[in-house]
């Protein structure tokens, strides 16, 4: 079963086991409607946990899990990630892709010369930023129209003619 990252537990809140979750989704309202998540450090070490209460506030999700009833129990979840199955992924609007489809894509310049490989995506307030591994170095590239010439999902290639400016 393939699992997909959708949130990260940041900290506990209050005495009754509530946790603050960083959302890694374009669909926060779908996130808080979920009744369960696979929770763990990585997709290979998860347990299925039932959500008893969920809310959105201040750009974060606030969750209560079944069996997590104290501050101390909630503290044990800090740093864990929340995953969902492929069947639970919300359909993407046209011209949108999932994060997991971008990670691993090749970045090439306008001449087709390989620049590097996308290893992560950061959701920043103004726009997303691609983390790209280039010959052992990490380079951050803005994911904006001015730099991204084309995005070819079938060939897993992002064309950015100005990528060399960021070295």
UniProtKB/Swiss-Prot annotation:
Q: Give the keywords, sorted.
A: Chaperone, Cytoplasm, Ribosome biogenesis, rRNA processing
Q: Where is the signal peptide?
A: none
Q: Which GO terms describe its biological process?
A: ribosomal small subunit biogenesis; rRNA processing
Q: Supply the NCBIfam families for this chain.
A: 16S_RimM
Q: What does this protein do?
A: An accessory protein needed during the final step in the assembly of 30S ribosomal subunit, possibly for assembly of the head region. Essential for efficient processing of 16S rRNA. May be needed both before and after RbfA during the maturation of 16S rRNA. It has affinity for free ribosomal 30S subunits but not for 70S ribosomes.
Q: Protein name, please?
A: Ribosome maturation factor RimM
State one molecular function term (GO).
Answer: ribosome binding
Query: Native species of this protein?
Result: Chlorobium chlorochromatii (strain CaD3)
SUPFAM superfamilies xref list: PRC-barrel domain, Translation proteins
What's a GO cellular component annotated to this UniProt protein?
Answer: ribosome
PANTHER family given for it?
RIBOSOME MATURATION FACTOR RIMM
Q: Which part of the chain is the PRC barrel domain?
A: 94-166
Q: List the disulfide bonds.
A: none
């Amino acid at each position: 079963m393939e699992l997909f990252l959708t949130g990260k537990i940041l900290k506990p809140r209050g005495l009754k086991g509530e946790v603050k979750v960083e959302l890694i989704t374009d669909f926060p309202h779908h996130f808080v409607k979920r009744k369960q998540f696979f929770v763990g450090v990585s997709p290979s070490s998860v347990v299925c946990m039932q959500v008893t209460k969920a809310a959105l506030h201040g750009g974060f999700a606030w969750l209560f899990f079944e069996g997590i009833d104290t501050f101390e129990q909630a503290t044990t979840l800090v740093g864990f990630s929340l995953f969902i199955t492929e069947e639970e992924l919300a359909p993407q609007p046209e011209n949108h892709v999932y994060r997991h489809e971008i990670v691993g894509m090749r970045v090439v310049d306008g001449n087709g010369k390989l620049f590097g490989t996308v290893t992560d995506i950061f959701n920043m307030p103004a726009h997303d930023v691609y983390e790209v591994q280039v010959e052992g170095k990490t380079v951050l590239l803005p994911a904006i129209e001015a730099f991204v010439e084309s995005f070819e999902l079938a060939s897993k290639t992002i064309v950015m003619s100005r990528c060399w400016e960021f070295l």
